[in-house]
Amino acid sequence: MRFSPAAIALSLTLAIMSSASISGRADKDIDARSIALVKTGDEETKAGRVDSAIGWYESALAVDPRNRAAYVGMARAVQAQGLNGKSIGFYNKALEIDPNDQIALAEQAHAFVAKGALEQARRNMARLTTVCRTDCASLGKLSAAINLASKKQQAQASAVDLKATLGAAPEPKAN
């Protein structure tokens, strides 16, 4: 009984201190070296040197793991290599830092479309619709990409159904 007030005060102090460290930093507090490394990675990506760009983005993340732009850049680079699943993971990391990042939401949805995961792409599009308030040009492109992929999936399903109903061709018999 005597130690209850002291224990409560100590636990409250620890809870406040731990929540302060979890809250992280704002984008403006990202290490300047990490920002410079991301810019170099972006330049390498634009020049078509994707492997080199990935190295720069990894360095940026080593300097400051809260650099959302580094995760987005890394996602773009691995997606350029055709690794859509891996890019989705990097977009997830960016969205963990800022769940309302419109660029990460839109580009992750495009990666979902490329992977054939249209339901997840639609979920991202719904989130993007609620987040986007002004310039939402990416929504039109995303909607068109989802519709096109959906039509392709339906056409492929129809072709499979048609093939199944036709069955095997009859064997020719000698007269």
Model-identified regions with their sequence ranges:
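Canonical tetratricopeptide repeat
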Residues: 73, 107, 141-145
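Position-specific recognition of the canonical hydrophobic site in helix A of tetratricopeptide repeat
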Residues: 38, 45-46, 75, 79, ...
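Terminal, low-structured helical/coil segments at or just beyond the last alpha-helical repeat
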Residues: 3, 28, 34, 126-175
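Conserved structural position within tetratricopeptide repeats
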Residues: 27-28, 61-62, 92-96, 130
